[in-house]
Regions:
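Negatively charged, low-complexity tracts enriched in Asp/Glu with abundant Ser/Thr
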Residues: 1-46, 68-79
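Mixed-charge, Lys/Arg-enriched low-complexity segments
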Residues: 1-3, 73-99
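Short, Lys/Arg-enriched charge-dense amphipathic segments
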Residues: 42-54, 91-97
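Intrinsically disordered, low-complexity regulatory segments enriched in Ser/Thr/Pro
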Residues: 50-80
Length: 99
């Protein structure tokens, strides 16, 4: 499942390279040697800011909080088995932060 971590990193780098000014995205990956590898992406948009974490096991945690009210607009814990499933979650997070 390390491909999920690579997919998240590649997607985040692609977004950043696209130069879209409306939503800012950054990402990090856990240090080598940790027993359970993970990568996470932070998203800041005009409507919300959020974070998505994916572990090599396929577990995903995603949250987004309204900039205006501080309330959660997205909060999920789930498991994915493919890049396609992870992409759908990434898109939901970005959409929540853009609106």
């Amino acid at each position: 499942m390390l491909t999920l971590l690579s997919f998240l990193a590649g997607w985040a780098e692609g977004w950043t390279a696209s130069g879209r000014p409306d939503v800012s995205i950054s990402w990090e990956q856990s240090a080598d040697g940790r027993p359970k590898q993970a990568a996470w992406m932070s998203v800041q948009g005009p409507a919300a800011w959020g974070q998505l974490t994916v572990w090599e096991s396929g577990e995903v945690a995603v949250e987004a909080m309204s900039v205006e009210t501080g309330e959660l607009v997205l909060s999920e814990q789930l498991a994915v088995a493919s890049d396609y499933e992870l992409l759908a979650i990434i898109r939901r997070l970005v959409a929540a932060c853009e609106v």
